[in-house]
Amino acid sequence: MKILGLNGSPRKNGNSMKLLESAINGAKDAGAETEIIHLYSMNFKGCRSCFACKRKSPMYGKGCAMKDDFTGVMESLLAADAWIFSTPIYNGHMSSSMSALLERFYFSHNSYDAHEKMVDREYPSLLIYNMNGNQNFLDKMGIENSCKYDVFLMESGFGKSQYFIANSTIQFDDYSKYHTAAVPIDAKMKLSSEQFPQDLQHVYNLGKNLLS
């Protein structure tokens, strides 16, 4: 069994990647084969609204017709048995790269003929989000509703899905190098040092049980 991880952050060693690696390690320890793709290393854009995936043609049911680096990612997704997506939250939403991926992947596999899946098997998925805002900010802005909608789309098109949000993450190794006067740095560093290891353990467990 293979689990594909997708890093939706421009950084390859940031919070998104650390969370993804922890979940992937859980999957490995459960016996899964794993692979990680860095989306920001790919060259692709979001949906162009060409509707080629909905036309009555031999292309119907074969995914997005636009050919770019997304094509290979789509093939890797469909060749795997489960997926782990990890993305930072920018301005209340997943990163633009992750959004571009999922809007094309979901829409090209969304049937207008019937409310049924266009794939021939179930693909369990885990969506991991992280943000530097704290839990109070997350609740106040209703960010979790967006994550729940992402899960709804994944379950509508592909199979059982779940999500996790890590909050109060650290953005910089050294805050003194940046204009961050409004940030309560000491309190933030203390909270992150206590909470982030727990978040890593939590997503490890989710990754380990993803195929169970």
PLM regions: where:
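Short, catalytically relevant binding-site loops at active-site mouths
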Residues: 90-92, 133-134, 170
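Short, glycine-/small-residue-rich phosphate/pyrophosphate-handling segment
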Residues: 96-97, 109-165
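The feature marks non-catalytic terminal segments
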Residues: 157, 176-185
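Short, solvent-exposed beta-strand-terminating loops
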Residues: 44, 161-177
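Residue-identity detector for glutamine
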Residues: 135, 162, 171, 195-201
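N-terminal beta1-alpha1-beta2 submodule of the flavodoxin-like/Rossmannoid cofactor-binding fold
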Residues: 1-114, 182-212
